[in-house]
Amino acid sequence: MEGPAFSKPLKDKINPWGPLIILGILIRAGVSVQHDSPHQVFNVTWRVTNLMTGQTANATSLLGTMTDAFPKLYFDLCDLVGDDWDETGLGCRTPGGRKRARTFDFYVCPGHTVPTGCGGPREGYCGKWGCETTGQAYWKPSSSWDLISLKRGNTPRNQGPCYDSSAVSSDIKGATPGGRCNPLVLEFTDAGKKASWDGPKVWGLRLYRSTGTDPVTRFSLTRQVLNIGPRVPIGPNPVITDQLPPSRPVQIMLPRPPQPPPPGAASIVPETAPPSQQLGTGDRLLNLVNGAYQALNLTSPDKTQECWLCLVAGPPYYEGVAVLGTYSNHTSAPANCSVASQHKLTLSGVAGRGLCIAAFPKTHQALCNTTQKTSDGSYHLAAPAGTIWACNTGLTPCLSTTVLDLTTDYCVLVELWPKVTYHSPSYVYGQFEKKKTKYKREPVSLTLALLLGGLTMGGIAAGVGTGTTALVATQQFQQLQAAMHDDLKEVEKSITNLEKSLTSLSEVVLQNRRGLDLLFLKEGGLCAALKEECCFYADHTGLVRDSMAKLRERLSQRQKLFESQQGWFEGLFNKSPWFTTLISTIMGPLIILLLILLFGPWILNRLVQFIKDRISVVQALVLTQQYHQLKTIGDCKSRE
């Protein structure tokens, strides 16, 4: 911006249809789906970049929601300028230039939304007065629509020269690390906290000088969010790709009392569990039933003498039991509030009365035994172990008070249980008999939520008590929690794929996920179909599986035993298929060459010796012939 100083700046200038088919199918399926939970915690990184040099002036990462992850960003003016202003005497290469730059005001103009007449990058988007929206100047530039405010830090302007503390003596006052003495503070405005940060936003910064041209620099602000959501599939629908048979039978270990170690024996460090593999349909559902059995067998062993545990084919697949508990406050998001713990599925059925957060509507106040309102401030409410917050926007282990203050969300603390029904053997066998038993009324289906509701708040999840039962109970409950978490993620992924699917309607209708999963188990002989349920027999030895699973286990053991008995040479052929071809190709020439090297000298010596012998014989014959002739001539002369 050129020209003399002005007396008064100008005023700021303020510049379908949904997928009905998918929605209808989801409503038909009875599954409540929301967008990503507003309480979902992400790893958010804000990056300030000098567009003149491409260097990063600030990179700040934090855990938070998309609503409250807007920290203050601190950096230095020289991080945005570099050596660009050296010709004006205000550059950052020398201490004097850094000190002089500190005495001038500065103003900032947005480049992401450029009003008419404000110019382009060359002018720093400040082509005329009134384009500036923030800065540190005597006329106090501001704006009601821009996304950020940029001010100077708390370093006094009259502080000494901006010497680099690493290059000068420590006695010199005013020396700072790197000679940075022009600190800036970037804050987000209310408009910035509501804006979309899908791409970088650009601003121009200029120093205000009474005469001459105001020097220009430009910077960008970018938000990077890790694990923000699943990838959008384009091509074959991935919903049914993980419908795999169980990889191996589930081994149920009965609880055993701990045995004291022998005197003088060193403590045994438990082996590290092998890395988990991606589970298919069979493994995931069987783990879910097995976890339910473990928890039920531990708390009510009389009910597992002989029973049938059944998975329902129709939703809801999970139930919630409202409980009372003590949550913990955190100023920053704890580790258990990660993206992997978030679920955008909502519960269609919650029983009991528990702890409620925020203002509940009258239609849901029957779920509240105690209602608490959040106080002022920004912090996270972490649910106790074994529980989760059930909100109208989804399931989450942590609540953000910032989100609760800005929205109409309401949440209740619940235990989450899979929809597993419990049947006695007589009822199940009666259903399969040719002449079915007639009941005056349909027997009441006992679910896991009715049998084990309140288990976590009773102390089992927290590990209350020092006996063996409490310890084993905690392990079994954690196994059930892990199985539920895996299954919830897969159901959630299936619904997301349905929402994003670009395939035909027939394929979308085919993806009634849980029905296909249970049909897959039934056709594989792994469960018995009882009405709309898939049932597994269980007794005190655990879940009974199909004999084919045991056969697969035996074959796997035999294969491992066979491989362990092989020598190292045989193992080479099994581990490297190309090794066999290579050996068979070069073995013939290699053997011939080896035979030549071994027997070649001996054969050559024998051949040379044979030739010498033959030559010696020939020479002897020649000499003998000559001697015979001389002797004959001598005899003739003597006769004469």
Curated annotation (Swiss-Prot):
<feature type="short sequence motif" description="YXXL motif; contains endocytosis signal">
    <location>
        <begin position="627"/>
        <end position="630"/>
    </location>
</feature>
<feature type="disulfide bond" description="Interchain (between SU and TM chains, or C-310 with C-535); in linked form">
    <location>
        <begin position="307"/>
        <end position="535"/>
    </location>
</feature>
<keyword id="KW-1043">Host membrane</keyword>
<keyword id="KW-0325">Glycoprotein</keyword>
<dbReference type="GO" id="GO:0046718">
    <property type="term" value="P:symbiont entry into host cell"/>
</dbReference>
<keyword id="KW-0564">Palmitate</keyword>
<feature type="glycosylation site" description="N-linked (GlcNAc...) asparagine; by host">
    <location>
        <position position="369"/>
    </location>
</feature>
<keyword id="KW-0945">Host-virus interaction</keyword>
<feature type="disulfide bond">
    <location>
        <begin position="356"/>
        <end position="368"/>
    </location>
</feature>
<feature type="glycosylation site" description="N-linked (GlcNAc...) asparagine; by host">
    <location>
        <position position="297"/>
    </location>
</feature>
<keyword id="KW-1160">Virus entry into host cell</keyword>
<feature type="region of interest" description="Fusion peptide">
    <location>
        <begin position="444"/>
        <end position="464"/>
    </location>
</feature>
<feature type="short sequence motif" description="CX6CC">
    <location>
        <begin position="527"/>
        <end position="535"/>
    </location>
</feature>
<feature type="short sequence motif" description="CXXC">
    <location>
        <begin position="307"/>
        <end position="310"/>
    </location>
</feature>
<dbReference type="InterPro" id="IPR008981">
    <property type="entry name" value="FMuLV_rcpt-bd"/>
</dbReference>
<dbReference type="GO" id="GO:0019062">
    <property type="term" value="P:virion attachment to host cell"/>
</dbReference>
<feature type="glycosylation site" description="N-linked (GlcNAc...) asparagine; by host">
    <location>
        <position position="336"/>
    </location>
</feature>
<keyword id="KW-1133">Transmembrane helix</keyword>
<keyword id="KW-0175">Coiled coil</keyword>
<feature type="region of interest" description="Immunosuppression">
    <location>
        <begin position="510"/>
        <end position="526"/>
    </location>
</feature>
<keyword id="KW-0261">Viral envelope protein</keyword>
<dbReference type="InterPro" id="IPR018154">
    <property type="entry name" value="TLV/ENV_coat_polyprotein"/>
</dbReference>
<comment type="function">
    <text>The transmembrane protein (TM) acts as a class I viral fusion protein. Under the current model, the protein has at least 3 conformational states: pre-fusion native state, pre-hairpin intermediate state, and post-fusion hairpin state. During viral and target cell membrane fusion, the coiled coil regions (heptad repeats) assume a trimer-of-hairpins structure, positioning the fusion peptide in close proximity to the C-terminal region of the ectodomain. The formation of this structure appears to drive apposition and subsequent fusion of viral and target cell membranes.</text>
</comment>
<feature type="coiled-coil region">
    <location>
        <begin position="473"/>
        <end position="509"/>
    </location>
</feature>
<feature type="topological domain" description="Extracellular">
    <location>
        <begin position="33"/>
        <end position="582"/>
    </location>
</feature>
<keyword id="KW-0165">Cleavage on pair of basic residues</keyword>
<feature type="disulfide bond">
    <location>
        <begin position="307"/>
        <end position="310"/>
    </location>
</feature>
<feature type="glycosylation site" description="N-linked (GlcNAc...) asparagine; by host">
    <location>
        <position position="43"/>
    </location>
</feature>
<dbReference type="GO" id="GO:0019031">
    <property type="term" value="C:viral envelope"/>
</dbReference>
<keyword id="KW-0946">Virion</keyword>
<feature type="disulfide bond">
    <location>
        <begin position="398"/>
        <end position="411"/>
    </location>
</feature>
<keyword id="KW-0812">Transmembrane</keyword>
<keyword id="KW-1161">Viral attachment to host cell</keyword>
<feature type="glycosylation site" description="N-linked (GlcNAc...) asparagine; by host">
    <location>
        <position position="329"/>
    </location>
</feature>
<comment type="subunit">
    <text>The mature envelope protein (Env) consists of a trimer of SU-TM heterodimers attached by a labile interchain disulfide bond.</text>
</comment>
<feature type="disulfide bond">
    <location>
        <begin position="337"/>
        <end position="391"/>
    </location>
</feature>
<feature type="signal peptide">
    <location>
        <begin position="1"/>
        <end position="32"/>
    </location>
</feature>
<keyword id="KW-0449">Lipoprotein</keyword>
<keyword id="KW-0472">Membrane</keyword>
<comment type="function">
    <text>The surface protein (SU) attaches the virus to the host cell by binding to its receptor. This interaction triggers the refolding of the transmembrane protein (TM) and is thought to activate its fusogenic potential by unmasking its fusion peptide. Fusion occurs at the host cell plasma membrane.</text>
</comment>
<feature type="topological domain" description="Cytoplasmic">
    <location>
        <begin position="604"/>
        <end position="640"/>
    </location>
</feature>
<feature type="glycosylation site" description="N-linked (GlcNAc...) asparagine; by host">
    <location>
        <position position="58"/>
    </location>
</feature>
